[in-house]
């Protein structure tokens, strides 16, 4: 007689074998005489011990998925996924009932914060150059603008008010500064 074995934890079919029944003993554990369903793409053939029948369960094992807070995970279990999506989010996306949507506010804040980080790195380098007396006139000018920018940024973050304008790298010629509305 043929019997069909399934894994004890996932209940997934894994092999068929010829079995000679022994008087007084039943089937080996995690085995059945019911023939499993034919394999089907995207599904695992699983034995439902409650109904004593084979069923199809969704099988996404090994696939990448994302939680709704953008955490990447790899599916390791059989079954219909809950609380995840197979759609990869974009850098500025947030999850909505309709799927991933780009959030303009989040995008602006993230880009602004990255730009501030870059400016801070430049500020640190220029500070070291000035302390080592190797900075030229242009670099000193830019350092002064960065220092002013960060002071205004702190004021903005702690006391409110407008976001400061981005610092200029180079000083404009005197005539462009004096006649900025005409040139």
Swiss-Prot record:
The protein's job, in short, is:
Chaperone involved, together with gp57, in the assembly of the distal-half tail fiber of T4. It is necessary for the maturation of protein gp37 to the dimeric structural subunit P37.
Query: Source organism's superkingdom?
Result: Viruses
* Name the record gives this protein: Tail fiber assembly protein
Q: Which family does the record assign?
A: Belongs to the tfa family.
Q: Which organism is it from?
A: Enterobacteria phage T4 (Bacteriophage T4)
Please provide the record's keywords in A-Z order.
Answer: Chaperone, Viral release from host cell, Viral tail assembly, Viral tail fiber assembly
- State the Gene Ontology BP annotations: virus tail fiber assembly
């Amino acid at each position: 007689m043929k019997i069909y074995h399934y894994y004890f934890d996932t209940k997934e079919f894994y092999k068929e074998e010829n079995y000679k029944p022994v008087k007084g003993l039943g089937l080996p554990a995690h085995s059945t005489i019911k023939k499993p369903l034919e394999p089907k793409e995207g599904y695992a053939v699983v034995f439902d011990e409650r109904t004593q029948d084979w069923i199809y369960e969704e099988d996404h094992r090994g696939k990448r998925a994302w939680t709704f807070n953008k955490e990447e995970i790899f599916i390791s279990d059989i079954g219909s996924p809950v609380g995840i999506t197979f759609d990869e989010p974009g850098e500025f996306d947030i999850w909505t009932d309709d799927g991933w949507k780009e959030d303009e506010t989040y995008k602006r804040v993230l880009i602004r914060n990255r730009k501030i980080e870059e400016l801070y790195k430049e500020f640190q380098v220029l500070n070291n150059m000035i302390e080592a007396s190797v900075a030229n006139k242009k670099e000193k000018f830019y350092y002064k603008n960065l220092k002013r920018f960060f002071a205004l940024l702190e004021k903005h973050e702690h006391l409110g008010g407008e976001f400061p304008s981005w610092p200029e790298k180079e000083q404009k010629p005197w005539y462009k500064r004096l006649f900025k509305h005409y040139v």
